[in-house]
C-alpha cells in the first residue's frame, strides 16, 4: 500500500478525520466500508442537501424521525467503523483484492484497471457480450458467480443505472 507522503506518519483515523473535515457531503454503506451487517448513512454540512436527501430517503427508509436502523445495528456499525480504522485490517482487505486481481489476470477475466483497494469491477459486457442489454448482463454475471462459487457480488451496471426516464430503455 502506498499513499501521499504528507500522511505517511498519520493513523488511519487521523486521515479519515482530515478527509471528513474537507467534504461537503458523503454516503457510506455499512456492509462494505463499515464492516457491519446492515445500514449506512448520508452526511452533509448543508441544510438544503439534507432536506432534499430526507425527501428521497422516505422512499427507502421512512421519515427521518422514525425510519432507519435499530440501536443494535447502529452499535454494530459503530464497532465496525472502529475496527475498519485498523491498518492491518485494511492491509488485509487490500491484499484480498490484489489476490483476486492476480487470479482473474491468470484466467484472462477482464476487469477495470486500476483496481481499487475496496473492490474489483469485472467487465461483464466483455464476458457476456452475447447477452442482450435488456437481459441485464452484469446482474446475470453476479448471479452466475454466486451459483458457481458461492461468492456474493453486486452489479454496477444496467440495473443499478436504472432506465432512461424518456425511452424507458436500459
From Swiss-Prot:
Q: Name one GO biological process term.
A: amino acid metabolic process
Could you list this entry's UniProt keywords, alphabetically sorted: Pyridoxal phosphate
Q: Which GO terms describe its molecular function?
A: lyase activity
Superkingdom of origin organism = Eukaryota
Query: Which InterPro entries does the entry link to?
Result: ArAA_b-elim_lyase/Thr_aldolase, PyrdxlP-dep_Trfase, PyrdxlP-dep_Trfase_small
Provide the cofactor list for this protein. pyridoxal 5'-phosphate
Positions where N6-(pyridoxal phosphate)lysine occurs in the chain: 32
What the entry lists under Gene3D superfamilies is as follows: Aspartate Aminotransferase, domain 1 (3.90.1150.10)
Annotated transmembrane regions: none
One Pfam match, by short name? Beta_elim_lyase
PANTHER family xrefs: BETA-ELIMINATING LYASE-LIKE PROTEIN-RELATED, TRYPTOPHANASE
Return the similarity comment: Belongs to the beta-eliminating lyase family.
Tell me the protein's name.
Putative beta-eliminating lyase-like protein
